[in-house]
Amino acid sequence: DSEEVATVARGFGAEVMMTDPACPSGTARMASVMDRLDGDFFLNVQGDEPFIAPDLLDALISRWKETGCPLVTAVSRIGDAGRLLATSVVKVVRAENGEAIYFSRSPVPHLRGVDPSEWTARRDYWAHVGVYGYDRATLAAYPRLGATELEAAESLEQLRFLAHGMTFQTVVTGYHPVAIDTPEDLEAARKMV
């Protein structure tokens, strides 16, 4: 929905599909243009995650093929309390089979009676990596599902799928997101390139 981004992308040869600025999320944008694209599976790399490695995208495609789960996403281990407590880092609670149970900006699960500074030493916590894979039918259903209270409360688009009974399979990656969510993140990213 940004002409500035579209101009830069066209400048390096990317094919650009503009979306309605009223689209509330990347998933809504993907759903709005999917009819112009061929394919059974769609990858959505969030705009604030510019350093996603191609092998992670390959791993998501493989997980989709292996499991048949219509939704896949990636997670990485959170190693420190600072990231765990940051609301800009989306946390993922995973089931034993790798399915995502919940996404939250809060540190979940809560370890009762343990100081939060010790939580990452006591159990694994997972950060969401801003990339999704959807099969065609599931992505097409997204706008019809309607927004949910959970999605609005956390401001996380993926909660719409969970609230409607759909599941995400997760891929664990050693990639640690370099998301650009704050001015400080942008400054750090500029130093990387």
What is each PLM-predicted segment?
Residues E15, E99, T167-Q169:
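Conserved beta-strand segments of alpha/beta enzyme cores
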Residues M18-T19, N44, T73-A74, Y102, ...:
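Structural signal for conserved beta-strand scaffold positions within catalytic alpha/beta enzyme cores
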Residues G39, T67-C69, M166:
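Short, high-confidence coil segments that cap the C-terminus of an alpha-helix
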Residues I52-L145:
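Conserved core of the sugar-phosphate nucleotidyltransferase
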Residues W119-V193:
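Conserved alpha/beta core of the MobA/IspD/sugar-nucleotide pyrophosphorylase nucleotidyltransferase superfamily
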